[in-house]
Curated annotation (Swiss-Prot):
Protein name, as recorded: Mating-type protein A-alpha Y4
One term under GO cellular component: nucleus
Record SUPFAM superfamilies: Homeodomain-like
Alphabetical list of CDD domains matching this protein: homeodomain (cd00086)
Comp. bias regions, Basic and acidic residues: 635-657
Compositional bias segments (type: Basic residues): 344-353
GO MF term list: DNA binding; DNA-binding transcription factor activity, RNA polymerase II-specific
Annotation: DNA-binding region: 152-211
Residues covered by region (Disordered): 255-296, 310-329, 340-359, 406-451, 626-736
InterPro entries assigned to the protein according to its UniProt record, in alphabetical order: AalphaY_mating_typ-dep-bd-dom, HD, Homeobox_CS, Homeodomain-like_sf
Keyword Transcription regulation: yes
Ranges annotated as biased composition (Low complexity): 668-682, 694-728
Length: 928
């Protein structure tokens, strides 16, 4: 190669000298004759009929045949287009004498690549058949062989009960699995999705109490899941029979397991001796002893036989007694129980008369066993059954192979580094005790969970094993035998990469092509140096070739620095580039300048590679269902509320129409009050209290039947149902809140208008039964009405009962003088006004003052005369409307003093508040 470069440099130097000599003698360069484009033969398309026939003979599915042919045809078409475009561009800079060789190179490259792809396509049927055989074997191994009872009957799928703990573990977190979870559970357990669905339905039907339910996007808490999984493993693993106690069938003896268990457990002479005895018991079949009882499984009989042999072989010495005591004191980590055996039903035997010397607990038809055997059986029953963790782990690894390679579909594949043989053995006795360490292999959950909440759903007894991709066949969900994609270069297609050759002697044809291309480049350089840039114009192809030579460094002064690689894509593979436009030799020395001149383009994929998420459609569907369910619930609530409001309006209109029927209740209350005056004092007081309670109850009942816009005055539940916020009743030491009409929000569109019927329902009617809104209402006043109570709940429950009962103690607190009764005319002091801040006895202030002056005892009522007090108007604000309250007496001064002459009335006035006292009547302030 060095000699070739030296020759080329000398040729270039001689050519330049010749051009300089000709230029010095006045010669001018002739215009180069345009090269004629060669005519290449048409590249023949691949024979698709032959490929289709071969695939059909292999019994490939029609869909797979169609996909394979379309991919093969499109790949060949792309390769043909790339070759034609590349060789057409290259033909401009090549001598016409080399057109034939260039055409041969073009045809050879096309045919070789098409033949390689044809070989790959014809290998598809074999791969597909092998894959189908693996899947059939996997199905037969997990689901059992196909057993059809008739020509038109399907076999019932087998339910794998060994995976029931896995389903129960999932049920502990979520009793309503989604379709995606049920599908994954079916793949993990080797069952059908329908079987998983039916199992969860039956389990939910039998379950008691509230069932757990998770949203479709929620994830199982993995810490609790791992803890439950380890607890489940501790419950299931002891059920498995260890290899030291398992009797192998003839021809299936596994000596490696016995040797491994002997090596792990044979650290002490006692363990080795016991293992040897167990091996002898397995190899030599012994006849069942006459005194041994038949158990539900072979496990109990084997343990009893071993313990019997130990008790017989050991001598009664101090050392044996010490060993026996230490063996009884050993606390085993897991108690061994045979949970797989069915419980035997024992028949109750009638007690028969026993023979002479026969014990009480033995039936008559059972032969008496010897004393030694009965003692041995008692010792065997009392001895603990220890669980060997190491032997159990060895048995589980042998009984259950390595997990499927698709257990890591949504997680990171474990490292393929094999542990060294001299590494210390892990302590598998700590299995299930606490959280596993980072380097422990006892955890059954693969790390790095990414997208699914069922990544770790594997049987708890499938212990980690070396990852072997060929051990477990593909499944239907992963195998995609109908999708093929062909690329236009070898590296993308999967063949061996084209690496640069070493500095060896190239082939003759390659050397000739190389020399031709280099001489063409030298010719262009000589033309550039010989003539001026304005005297001659180069074609587009020649200008591009010249720019490429400049990029490669093939200038006049740098011709000695040329480096060549005969068959190289190394520069293009250094970073990711577009596949070569032509399969010719090309080396880029100045990569930055080549990118700047757009000679080399970085490869940009037409479509971004997106890893599809298999669970995205199911999650989106679940979210749409949740939104649809929420809309339905909201609509149902709105319809229910509208129906309720409609019923309330109908009820309110019905109550307004039936308002005359309320007059009977008011008249009965008036008659009960009138009847109290004719009874004795004690009976009348009791009767008045009773009538007062009845009137309050009737007023509450009438207030409930009022309009829906009128707040209820009787119960808290009705206020809650009406949707109003009622003001609370302040305590005696608190100030009254400032309220207005706007503070009461009602359900209607209009404000409450006080009608005569509503006023009669709230405050009662007079004796004549005619109540008008603008008229005064009078009711007889009795001393029993001087005591008032206030509700502690803050509701207007007693307003209708107490609104017509004025307070004498606060009657004149708003006036400057309380001597309006002209008590000074009788020679008495003026009455002291009650303090406005107290509530305890202010209602009885007037009577206490009269009794203190002995006016009711010695003084005759007929001798009293007084001046009628001026009427004291007051205001009561109830339900947004204001009413006037007036307290006065008779105009006659000569009439005797009578308490019944004191009357008061209510009348309508404008909204507003004026001069409040401190008397609380059912949560409403009454200003008097």
């Amino acid at each position: 190669m060095a000699e070739l470069l030296a020759c080329l440099q000398s040729i270039s130097a001689h050519a330049k000298d010749m051009m300089a000599l000709a230029r010095s003698r006045g010669a001018t360069g002739s215009r180069p004759t345009p090269t004629t484009l060669p005519h290449f033969d048409e590249l023949l398309p691949p024979n698709l009929d032959f490929v289709r026939t071969r695939l059909q003979e292999a019994r490939l599915p029609p869909k797979a045949i169609k996909g394979t042919l379309s991919a093969y045809e499109s790949a060949c078409a792309r390769w043909k287009h790339d070759l034609e475009e590349a060789f057409d561009r290259t033909a401009h800079s090549i001598s016409p004498h080399n057109f034939q060789r260039l055409a041969q190179l073009r045809t050879r490259l096309y045919v070789e690549q098409v033949q390689k792809w044809l070989y790959e396509v014809l290998q598809v049927p074999e791969r597909w058949k092998a894959e189908m055989e693996k899947q059939r074997a996997h199905i037969n191994a997990t689901m059992g062989p196909d057993k059809t009872t008739g020509p038109g009957k399907r076999s019932r799928p087998k339910f794998h009960s060994e995976y029931t703990p896995v389903l129960e573990l999932y049920f502990h977190f979520n009793a309503y699995p989604t379709y995606a979870d049920r599908r994954i559970l079916a793949e993990k357990t080797g069952m059908l999705t329908r079987q998983i669905t039916v199992w969860f339905q039956n389990h939910r039907r039998r379950a008691k109490g509230p069932l757990p339910r998770m949203s479709p996007t929620a994830k199982i808490p993995m810490e609790e899941f791992e803890r439950q999984l380890e607890n489940l493993a501790r419950k299931i693993v002891p059920v498995l029979l260890p290899p030291t106690l398992r009797r192998f069938a003839p021809g299936n003896e596994n000596k490696s397991l016995a040797a491994a268990s002997r090596q792990s457990a044979g650290k002490s002479s006692k363990n080795a001796k016991r293992l040897s005895e167990l091996e002898k018991a397995q190899q030599v079949p012994r006849k069942p002893s006459e005194n041994a009882e038949a158990g539900p499984s072979s496990l109990g009989a084997m343990l009893a036989r071993v313990m019997h042999n130990d008790s017989v072989s050991k001598k009664k010495s101090k050392k044996a007694k010490k060993e026996k005591a230490s063996q009884q004191n050993v606390v085993c980590d897991v108690e061994m129980r045979d949970a797989t055996a069915t419980k035997e039903k024992r028949r109750k035997m009638k007690k028969l008369p026993r023979a002479a010397g026969q014990p009480f607990d033995v039936p008559m038809d059972v032969e008496r066993a010897d004393k030694a055997s009965r003692k041995a059986m008692k010792k065997a029953k009392k001895s603990p059954r220890a669980f060997d963790s190491r032997a159990e782990l060895a048995f589980a690894q042998a009984a259950y192979p390595s997990p499927s390679q698709y257990a890591y579909v949504h997680s990171r594949k474990p490292s393929a580094q094999k542990p060294s043989s001299d590494s210390p053995r892990k302590d598998f006795g700590q299995l299930g005790k606490g959280r596993p360490s980072s380097n422990s292999t006892s955890s059954t959950v693969p790390p790095h969970r990414v997208s699914s909440r069922l990544n770790a759903m594997r049987p708890p007894y499938a212990f980690p094993a070396p990852y072997n991709a060929a051990a477990v066949p593909l499944t239907f969900s992963v195998a995609s035998s109908t999708q093929f994609a062909f690329a236009t270069d070898n590296r993308s297609f999967g063949f061996a990469e084209r690496t640069p050759r070493k500095a060896t002697v190239p082939a003759a044809c390659t050397l000739i092509d190389y020399l031709i291309s280099k001489f063409a480049g030298l010719r262009l350089l000589c033309v550039e140096q010989s003539v001026s840039s304005r005297s001659i114009s180069l074609s587009t192809s020649e200008s591009g070739k010249l720019a490429g030579l400049r990029t490669e460094g093939l200038t006049t002064g740098e011709a000695s620095g040329v480096q060549t690689h005969v068959d190289s894509y190394a520069a293009r593979r250094a970073i990711t580039y577009v596949p070569p436009s032509a399969p010719l030799d090309c080396v880029v020395h100045n990569l930055a300048r080549a990118l700047q001149l757009k000679q080399v383009r970085p490869m940009v994929l037409a479509q971004p590679v997106v890893q599809p998420d298999a669970f995205a459609p199911f999650i989106a569907r679940a979210e749409r269902r949740a939104r649809r369910k929420e809309r339905k619930q909201r609509k149902a609530l709105e319809e229910k509320q509208a129906k309720k409001d409609r019923k309330e309006r109908q009820k309110a209109s019905r109550s307004q129409r039936d308002s005359p029927s309320m007059d009977a209740d008011v008249q009965s209350r008036a008659s009960s009050v009138a009847s109290t005056s004719s009874l004795p004092a004690r009976k009348s007081s009791k009767k008045s209290r009773k009538s007062k309670g009845e009137s309050a109850a009737s007023s509450r009942a009438t207030s409930v039947a009022s309009s829906v816009r009128t707040p209820s005055l009787s119960s808290t539940s009705s206020r809650r149902s009406s949707g109003m916020s009622m003001p609370g009743t302040p305590r005696p030491e608190q100030d009254l809140p400032i309220m207005a009409t706007a503070d009461f929000n009602f359900a209607g569109d209009e404000d409450v208008t006080m009608t005569p019927d509503l006023a009669a329902q709230l405050f009662g009617e007079d004796e004549d039964g005619a109540a008008a809104l603008g008229q005064m209402q009078y009711e007889e006043f009795s001393p029993d009405m001087l005591t008032f109570t206030s509700t502690a709940g803050g509701a207007l429950s007693d307003m209708t009962a107490d609104v017509n009962m004025p307070d004498l103690g606060n009657a004149y607190t708003s006036q400057q003088s309380v001597d309006d009764m002209n008590w000074t005319g009788f020679g008495l002091d003026a009455q002291n006004s009650a303090s406005p801040g107290l509530f305890g006895d202010e209602s009885n202030t007037g009577l206490d003052w009269l009794l203190s002056h002995n006016l009711l005892g010695d003084t005759q009522m007929s001798d009293l005369s007084y001046t009628a007090p001026t009427s004291t108007p007051s205001q009561i604000n109830i339900l947004g409307s204001t009413y006037a309250c007036e307290l006065g007496g008779s105009d006659s001064l000569g009439t005797p003093f009578n308490m019944n002459d004191w009357t008061f009335g209510l009348g309508a006035c404008d909204d507003g508040f004026a001069g409040f006292g401190n008397n609380l009547l059912g949560g409403t302030a009454v200003a008097v």
